[in-house]
Amino acid sequence: MTKDEFLPHNCDLCGSADAAEIEAAKHYQNGQPLHVCKNCGLVYIKERRSANRIAEVWSEDIYEKGYTAKIPAVKARQTYVADFVDDALNIKGKSVCDIGGGEGQFLEIIREPTYGASVFAIEPSERNCQLMADNNIEAFCGSIEDYIDSGKTKNQKFDVVTIMWTIENCQSCRAMMEAAYDVLKDGGHVVISTGSRILVPFKKPLQYYLGPKATDTHPIRLSNNTITGLMAEGGFERTHINRFIDTEYLVAIGKKADRSKKIDWPKDDWSAIVEFFSRWHKETQDHYSDA
């Protein structure tokens, strides 16, 4: 495979190839298409590069060109997640692994005495791993796939795995969930945090949700139902969900279950998704096109 070869993908959640294009998205994505699965309602990008290539792009092109989590808006959402998870699970004394740990800011927050967690990160960016090392945060420098391949999961498992604003940025969300399952102790919990944007009141102009850069660096977009489905298909029973309808964030917690048993989950109506984006596009163009 060449470095930037894009390959077609079916729906990450249910595997269906039957999808409808969300026409409104092209206006914001430099003509790149966005699709919604007609079977389950997942919003996703069909054409993608390899998992390692996408991790490389995030490490070299995005983080190395000035992205930082050390701004008030990001710290606020990380603190929100810390409070929500601690209220639900009481993480004091528990081991927490953050997949896609970034600069380690969330782990800094939850290792403080207020929360008292024991922290670890898996992070592909060498720059970010060095930042965490300088701050005495233990990290595995590589992708989650690299971590699994290293064999470390045989002796190192965690009470809680957090995937914060990361699941939507990886090439395969299913592979990410399988990896989270593998690194958790029996009865452990996974936490997925992302933006609350789909089938909720519009939170921002659409150009600040969709953008012109390569769309496979953000190949899925989750709703309440599809985040629940992602957990169920990965072997997790959803136990907690935040009040996502009127906040910026969608935060779900799932408990590691028996993967051999089917877990039912609700689906979204794909036509409602298409109509939702059409309304969002109209609202943006009518009132916020120059915002």
What are these regions (language model features)?
Residues C14-A20, N224-N242:
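A SAM-dependent methyltransferase catalytic signature shared across enzymes that methylate proteins
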Residues N128, Q171, I198-P201, T247-Y249:
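Flexible loop/turn segments at secondary-structure boundaries
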Residues W165-N169:
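A short His-aromatic
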Residues R174-H189:
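A short glycine-rich, Lys/Arg-flanked "PGG" loop and its adjoining helix->strand segment in the class I
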Residues L107-E108, S172-C173, P201-K203:
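Short glycine-/acidic-enriched loop or helix-start segments at secondary-structure transitions
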Residues M1-Q156, V160-M164, M176-M177, R243, ...:
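Conserved N-terminal segment of class I S-adenosyl-L-methionine
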Residues S193-I220, N225-L230:
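Short, glycine-/aromatic-enriched active-site segment of Class I SAM-dependent methyltransferases
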